[in-house]
Amino acid sequence: MKNFGQQIKTDELKGINHHNWSLCQAQSNTQKAKILFGRIPGGKLTRKLGWKILATGIIAQAVLLVSPAFANSTQKNLSYSQLLDKIQAGEVTEIDYYPSRGIAKVSLKGQRSREGMYIVQMFEHVPELLDQVRAQKIDFELKRSPDNSVAMGIIFNILIVFVVIVVLLAILRRSSQSQGNALNFGKSRARFQMEAKTGVLFEDVAGIEEAKEELQEVVSFLKKPEKFTAIGAKIPKGVLLVGPPGTGKTLLAKAIAGEAGVPFFSISGSEFVEMFVGVGASRVRDLFKKAKENAPCIIFIDEIDAVGRQRGAGIGGGNDEREQTLNQLLTEMDGFEGNSGIIIIAATNRPDVLDVALLRPGRFDRQVTVDLPAYKGRLGILEVHARNKKLTPEISLEAIARKTPGFSGADLANMLNEAAILTARRRKEGITPNEIDDAIDRVTIGLSLTPLLDGKKKRLIAYHELGHALLMTLLKNSDLLNKVTIIPRSGGVGGFAQPIMDEGMIDSGMYTRGWLIDRITISLGGRAAEEEIFGLAEVTVGAANDIRSVASLAREMVTRYGMSDLGPLALENPNGEVFLGRGWQSQQPEYSEEVAIKIDHQIRTMVFHCYEKARKIIRENRVLMDRLVDLLIEKETIEGDEFRRIVSEYTELPKKQKSLINLEKKI
C-alpha cells in the first residue's frame, strides 16, 4: 500500500596492450600525422600553425608562378625585326642585354626613365645586331643576372610533394581513427576521476538521513579501514540504491565521490550494451581491470536495470548480448578472482526486474531504500535548496513542507526554482507565499492559462469542479480542501479542486478503506454534478481522467488490498508490465474466469455505489451549489477556508471540517 499514489565523459584511461603489428604501424603513422598538426603534446607545431604554414607555402608558390607572368603582361614588347628597324631609324638610345633570360631591354629616344624600356626576345646569336649597334654608336651593356629557373622548379616540385604528403597523412589519420574506434568498442566508457570534484558533499544531501548514514559508513571504511578490520569487519562489496525517481540516488553517488577521496568510476547501465555481440562483456572486463589498477576505488553504475534484468525467455530472443553482459558482471563482482578494495554502488528505480543472482550478498551486500521524504526530510531539502534563494520574512519552510506530501527531492528543488523564476518575472525583490503556491500548482497541475470567456463552458466547468470540492468538504474521511479554481491549466485542465493531503497517511502509506472510498466518491463528483445540473445529454468527457483513476483504484481495492466481499485475497501482481527477462507465464491471471466475473461485479458495485452517493449529496445541496457557482465564476478561485464557511451556513460539516473552522475563528 505504501506505493499507492506515489510516482514511483572524462576521457578513457590511456594505454592499450597486446596489439598486432599492423595496428601499431597504423598508430605510428597516425601519431606522425598528429605531430605534424600538433595534435599530441610532443609535436613542435600546433595544429593551427601547421595549417598556416601549408597555406603560406601554397600562396607563396602561386605568387612566384603568377608574378612573372603578371609583370610581363604589363611591360611593352618589341619584336626583333622592329628593333632592327628602330636601330636603323636612329630611335634607339640604349640596349641592355640579358643572355641568361634571352631578352634585351631597349630605351628609345624621348623616354624619361628606364622604367618604360621595351622588352625584346633575343636569339642566341645576334651578330647583325651588334654590327648595327656599333654603326649607330648605341650604348650596349651586357647584364649578368642569376638564373632562377632551376631554383623555381625545385621549389615548385617540393611544394607539390608537400601537398601530396599532407593529403595522404590526413587520409591515413582518418582511416586509423575509424579503425581505432572499431577496436575500442570493447573498451569501457566509464568516466574516471582520480579525486572526483562533483561539488556535492554529504552536507548538501538532506531528507534521506538513513540512506546517507549507510553510505557515510562506506566512505569511512575507505578512509580508515583499520577502524573496521581491527574487529574483523569486512567492507561491503556492493550497495544498491533503490527508490522512486527524483529521490536523490544519483545525488548520493555524487556526494560519495566528493567525500571519498579515492578514484571514482561512473557509468550508466545502458553504456555497456551495443549492437555488436560481446561488446558489453568486454567493457565490463575492461572496467574492472582499470578499477583493480586503481584500487581502492568506487564504481558507480546508474540505472543498473538496463543491464541487470532477470535472465530468461522474455519477449523475443534478442537479449543474449544483455545476458552475456550480465553474466560477466556477476563474475567480476563475486567470481573466482577477488576484487578487494573495489566498492560497487548502483542505482535503480526498478529493483523488481533485477536478476536474483545480482541481489545476493557478496555482490550487493546492502540494499538502501531512498524513499520519498517525510515531513522532516522535505523540510531539510527545502532548507538546502533555499540557501541561495531570496525569501521574504512571511515565507515559512515548515508550512511549505506540510503542503507538499508526496513530493520528491527533485520536485521540491524544481518547485523552489519555479517560484524564483515567477518572482523575477513579476519584478519582486523576494519570493512570497503567492509565488510558492503558484509554483506548487505549476509543478503538480500545469501552467496557468488565460481564464475562460465563454459563459456556458465556464459555468459547466464551475459546476464540475464544485462537485469535487463540495464532496471533499462534506465527506467525513476526505482530505481538507485547499482551494477550487476554474482558471485553466496546460494539458487540458479546465480547473481543479486541490486538497490538502494528509501528510501522515501519505508518508506512512497507511490508507484506510474509508479514505479510499471517499476518494472514489470525490473523483466522481464532477461527473455527478454535470448529470444532476445539466442532464445526461449534456455530460462531457471532462471526467475522463477521473473515471480512469476511479477504475484503477477500485480494482486495486478488490484485487490487491482485499477490501471487497471477495475477502482478503491478493488476486493480481502489482507489477502488471511485461519486461525483458520476465516471461509471459508470470503475467497470467492467478484466478479462474468465475472469479474474474466476481471481481468485475465487485468493482462495478463499489463504483456505482460511490457515484449514487455523490449524486445524492449534490442533489440535496443544489441551492448551495448555485450560490457557489456564481461566486466561483465571479472570483475564479475560492480558498478552502472561505469555501468551508459558506458551506457551513447551509449544512452541517463533518467533525474534522468543523474543528478546522473553529480553529480559523480563533485565529
Curated annotation (Swiss-Prot):
It is found in: Cellular thylakoid membrane. The keyword Transmembrane applies. Residues 1-50, 173-667 are cytoplasmic. The active site is at E465. The chain crosses the membrane at residues 51-71, 152-172. Pfam families: AAA (PF00004), AAA_lid_3 (PF17862), FtsH_ext (PF06480), Peptidase_M41 (PF01434). InterPro entries: AAA+_ATPase, AAA_lid_3, ATPase_AAA_core, ATPase_AAA_CS, FtsH, P-loop_NTPase, Pept_M41_FtsH_extracell, Peptidase_M41. Its main location: membrane. Residues 72-151 are lumenal. Its cofactor is Zn(2+). Binds 1 zinc ion per subunit. One of its GO terms (molecular function) is ATP hydrolysis activity. Homohexamer. Acts as a processive, ATP-dependent zinc metallopeptidase for both cytoplasmic and membrane proteins. Plays a role in the quality control of integral membrane proteins. This is ATP-dependent zinc metalloprotease FtsH. It comes from Trichodesmium erythraeum (strain IMS101).
